[in-house]
């Protein structure tokens, strides 16, 4: 380690630099790998009895998406409970969580040497660094004192990042990369590092701690309910109820009672007083999924609640005050529903004070790989397998697929592949290859053809300026529709200043 003293000095200096947390973590792991000559290392956040990878070096890409319950991984549990450096003997019978996941050509090799560095702040565990090598003697020459220095630097780096995020949350200037305060136990973790997910996280953080109504839009299976849960958990109402109601599953005959409640004797079968969803969500949040399926009659009654903040149970003349925040979701384009007369314009404007668009999985790039790891670990636990590894060929296949069913489809595909692999082998170490995935390989050009602006091959009769204007106008119109007719979101998607976009749109006669 003496030869790389300058690198450790740089790690210390990084703590006060303007580096992003991601870059700081990656530099830390790179320095560890160079210093210890290990084959892989990982920085993990500890929260609610789970270790979540924040950065890795030398491991498969899907590891970042995995969440490791210490109850399922004896080595990680040993690190969490040790309070000091943990050196696992080369003949340890405890399975390593990274067996088969180290980026190495000889996949049959398993990890032979492993060190765990618990990261402690004021004697509280906040994370860990794991260091793995194939050579069983690789770490013998390094003293515990040297390893404790690494542990202290890593703990300070992670603690600084957590403090910065907390301060940004308090000031309302949350970073787009906010992802540390996450927990598999509360069901609101959103896996992803793509630009589309960063924008989604930024929008959630911007509006969560307000009282504004939110309209969540996006295709089926993209995770709109997850976004609603995140909005609630990050709000001042987080300690109160989040009440869910699927409007599409409501028969017309019981819909009003479900929303507003009824009194005894209000109708046949009303044998007692009953609260509706609005009362159940009083001082909390009501999530109305598939809001576009509500009848026009119920839309009118919902609008009244939003306007006056009170409800009437069926059969009761009294008004009951409620303090309920509304989050609605739909896979329909409600502006079109308004034009068609199927949705009230006044209710639409009340609900869409702050619209949030959830991107489809096909637009999220490498997030597919992270989600594959996340669902693979869930399948491993369900099947009681020792490990699940996805081959590089399978990862390529999954990334090339267009995912019309989005995240929900991906979860089912991974679960099915794991079951097939388990049925075909007696080995508890499962390997998922392309043959286990019942999806067709798609060409990148075919996958994206629907999103391209196609120009007919005809004789050119326009000058360059006219052709450029036409292209820009088409692109702006297309993006504007994709962003639910929101100019600010359109500007972000096109990476333009909002003012510049408005001026360009006026010049192209796209707006007055």
From Swiss-Prot:
InterPro entries per UniProt: AAA+_ATPase, GAF, GAF-like_dom_sf, Homeodomain-like_sf, NorR, P-loop_NTPase, Sigma_54_int, Sigma_54_int_dom_ATP-bd_1
Annotated ranges, domain Sigma-54 factor interaction: 190-419
Metabolic or biological pathway, per its Swiss-Prot or TrEMBL entry: Nitrogen metabolism; nitric oxide reduction
One Pfam match: GAF
Residue ranges: DNA binding: 487-506
Residues annotated as binding ATP: 218-225, 281-290
Source superkingdom: Bacteria
Keywords (A to Z) from UniProt: ATP-binding, DNA-binding, Nucleotide-binding, Transcription, Transcription regulation
GO MF terms held by the record: ATP binding; ATP hydrolysis activity; DNA binding; DNA-binding transcription factor activity
SUPFAM superfamilies: GAF domain-like (SSF55781), Homeodomain-like (SSF46689), P-loop containing nucleoside triphosphate hydrolases (SSF52540)
Gene Ontology biological-process entries: phosphorelay signal transduction system
Gene3D superfamilies the record matches: 1.10.8.60, 3.30.450.40, Homeodomain-like (1.10.10.60), P-loop containing nucleotide triphosphate hydrolases (3.40.50.300)
HAMAP family: NorR
General function of this protein: Required for the expression of anaerobic nitric oxide (NO) reductase, acts as a transcriptional activator for at least the norVW operon. Activation also requires sigma-54.
Protein known as: Anaerobic nitric oxide reductase transcription regulator NorR
